[in-house]
Amino acid sequence: MVVRALVRAHPLSRISCRYSSLAASSFNPKPYIPSVSGVQKSLPFDNLLEQYSRVHWDDTVTYDDPTVQRLFKNLMSGSRAALASAITLVESRHPTKRAQGNMLLKMVLDEEREKYKKYGRDSMIFRVGISGSPGVGKSSFIEALGAELTENRGKKVAVLTIDPTSAMTGGSVLGDLTRMQELSRNPRAYIRQSPTSGSLGGVTRGIHEAVILCEGAGYDIVIIETVGVGQSETSVSDMCDMMCLLLSPAHGDELQGVKRGIMEMSDLLVVTKDDGDLQAKAKMTQAEYISALKFMRPRLDVWSPKVMRSSIMNKESVSAVCTSLYEFWDTIGESGDLERRRQDQMKKWMWNHVKDEIMAVFQKHPKIIHLKNHKIFINLLLQAPKLEKDISSGKITPGLAAETMIRTFFGV
């Protein structure tokens, strides 16, 4: 019973080597598979793999699904409520909701493909990623930029913000709406906050699909605000047409605080807070980055990154940044880089999803949580604590430990 209780919870680190001598006849528990809601499901022994598949995938959803049809109709009419519900579907890990989200995405993509044939690049949404260190003023800058785009340029703006998730509680503050109150009340703007949920790269799972849904809802530009600056932050550039890096003039030598990777991926650098006593520092920071960029190869042959200064107190400076955004948009559109970049991004995100799915499948596979194939199971249980100990003592790398577990799983 003790072994059964330990196995049903399956914390790999709690089962020690004293169970290695137990015979196969000692193991006869009911296997379980955790559902997406976190509730453990007891499954009968027969047809385990088939039922396991149902936990992960739902093949019963079709084009005629009433939820899909309702959301698609309302989404095409520009409903913000439908857009919010659709993004919730594609972010969900529930098999039925995820299947509905995928079906909805396919219908939206079909519709957008027809629009592209008719209107060309004018039917495409402009994807702008904005990153910067905490406190640089990302939310304030986005609100000022959104006001310029909606009020003076007649654009519909979607803002997707990513907030960090607590590693201890799994919670997230999601406080960007409190910093964008004016934009959140703008009928031509939509703001969606999402937690990272442990995802690396400053973005969250489903954000690429959310961009597609915003395009289907008729928005002209989507602004993606990331968690903050870091070397893994460069993955946000894999879903954007343009990367904008915000810099603060108040932190001394900014060149020491910004990673080279994010600079190389940036198409526009903006020094914020260019007003009052900080104007002199803003000019100095601008000069430093102009000099630094001379030693970096531009990401695109048709565009050289610019370094600008801006202040939310000065609407003309915000308008100048907006002009540079669309100058970039026109340049890559006319050169053909836009279409090529979008195609490459779709391929990269396919492999990103493959990695996520493989991890989920590996953790919940019957070979891991079911004891009929007890040799593989026991080997994994016994290996994990030893591998963790070897990693802590520096005997092996985490990569080698992961490869060892996967090879054991597949019996290689």
Curated annotation (Swiss-Prot):
Subcellular location: Mitochondrion
Documented EC number(s): 3.6.-.-
Residue range of the transit peptide in the UniProt record, numbered on this chain: 1-15
Residues that span the membrane, as ranges: none
SUPFAM superfamilies: P-loop containing nucleoside triphosphate hydrolases
Matches recorded under Pfam families: MeaB
CDD domains reported for this sequence: MMAA-like
Gene3D superfamilies noted in UniProt: 1.10.287.130, 1.20.5.170, P-loop containing nucleotide triphosphate hydrolases
GO CC annotation, single: mitochondrion
Binding site for GTP: G132, S133, P134, G135, V136, G137, K138, S139, S140, D275, S311, I312, M313
GO molecular function terms noted in the UniProt entry: ATP binding; GTP binding; GTPase activity
InterPro entries per record: GTPase_ArgK (IPR005129), P-loop_NTPase (IPR027417)
Keywords: ATP-binding, Chaperone, GTP-binding, Hydrolase, Mitochondrion, Nucleotide-binding, Transit peptide
Enzyme class label: hydrolase
Task performed by this protein: May have GTPase activity. May also bind and hydrolyze ATP. May function as chaperone. Likely to have a role in propionyl-CoA metabolism and adenosylcobalamin synthesis.
Protein family per UniProt: Belongs to the SIMIBI class G3E GTPase family. ArgK/MeaB subfamily.
Protein name stated in the entry: Methylmalonic aciduria type A homolog, mitochondrial
Protein source organism: Caenorhabditis briggsae
